[in-house]
């Protein structure tokens, strides 16, 4: 798949960014007036761990293929997998 043809949509044709926006709105609604802390890091950890888990499944746990798919160094991938206890 070329860079021009890469999809930024979920399986239903909706942009991933739209899904994130909906999830974040719901998160803030559920706070019921409480002040959130460290939202940026929370979102990154939630998204990154899910992304790594799904990509590893798609690559049959082949770290080389997964790192290529993600566009990161294999050593970086291993470090992240260990940090999220996915290895």
Tell me what each language-model feature is.
Residues 2-18, 22-87:
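Bacterial C-terminal helix-turn-helix
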């Amino acid at each position: 798949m070329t860079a021009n043809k890469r999809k930024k949509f979920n399986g239903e044709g909706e942009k991933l960014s739209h899904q994130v926006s909906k999830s974040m709105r719901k998160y803030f609604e559920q706070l019921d007036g409480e002040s959130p802390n460290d939202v940026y890091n929370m979102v990154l950890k939630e998204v990154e761990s899910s992304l790594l888990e799904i990509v590893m499944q798609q690559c049959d746990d082949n770290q080389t293929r997964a790192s290529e798919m993600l566009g990161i160094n294999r050593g970086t991938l291993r470090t992240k997998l260990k940090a999220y206890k996915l290895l």
